[in-house]
């Protein structure tokens, strides 16, 4: 916040408080684009206001006030910070109250042609292309391996929505994260499958819809 405040020319906290939400988000994102410093990006977080939000998520979890349902929780390899410890703690919390939580890490760096101002790596939200099997709506040079990975993830998420278990009714290898099974399901391409892991042909430009 201090970086954006100084960079945007706010010389007092009072002036910054008077700025519109749109201006603060624009300033933060512009700062990150120009400087390459992603810590300047303004992100929104829930605030306990006693009206819409009565308590923090952490407090609700520790008080066993969360719905008694299975959970799926994960992060991407190049996400916004190290998410693994918090995810592990949440899963153990669910175990302590008799619940289940399935943890995952998405570790497929998205294929790219290295154009300017395009995110690279397994960045935050990059897993959604695979979960919803919407690869065809993106310009990136997907390989057959990407399509195969997307099918695996789509099936797991669909099973979880339908059965509360990403493995489906017949079971599988994705076990809940517990004290005795402290492991994340890892989603990535098979490095041994060179044909499907290498960068494939780009999708025609007329089919490119999103910059990320």
Residue ranges with predicted function:
Residues 29, 88, 92-212:
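Mobile gating loops/cap/lid regions near enzyme active sites that modulate substrate access
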Residues 1-93:
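Substrate-access "cap/lid" subdomains that shape
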């Amino acid at each position: 916040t201090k970086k954006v405040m100084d960079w945007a020319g706010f010389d007092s906290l009072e002036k910054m408080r008077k700025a519109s939400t749109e201006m603060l988000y624009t300033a933060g994102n512009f700062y990150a684009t120009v400087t390459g410093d992603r810590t300047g990006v303004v992100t929104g977080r829930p605030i306990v206001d006693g009206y819409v939000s009565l308590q923090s998520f952490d407090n609700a979890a520790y008080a066993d006030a969360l719905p008694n349902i299975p959970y799926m929780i994960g992060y991407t390899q190049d996400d916004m910070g190290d998410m693994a410890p918090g995810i592990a703690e949440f899963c153990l919390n669910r175990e302590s109250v008799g619940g289940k939580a399935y943890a995952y890490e998405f570790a497929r760096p998205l294929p790219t042609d290295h154009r300017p101002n395009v995110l690279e790596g397994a960045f935050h939200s990059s897993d959604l292309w695979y979960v919803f099997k919407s690869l065809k709506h993106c310009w990136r040079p997907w390989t057959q391996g990407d399509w195969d990975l997307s099918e695996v993830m789509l099936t797991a998420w669909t099973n979880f929505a339908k059965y509360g278990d990403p493995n489906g009714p017949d079971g599988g290898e994705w076990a809940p994260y517990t004290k005795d099974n402290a492991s994340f399901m890892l989603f990535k391409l098979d490095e041994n499958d060179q044909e499907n892991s290498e960068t494939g042909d780009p999708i025609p430009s007329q089919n490119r819809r999103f910059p990320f």
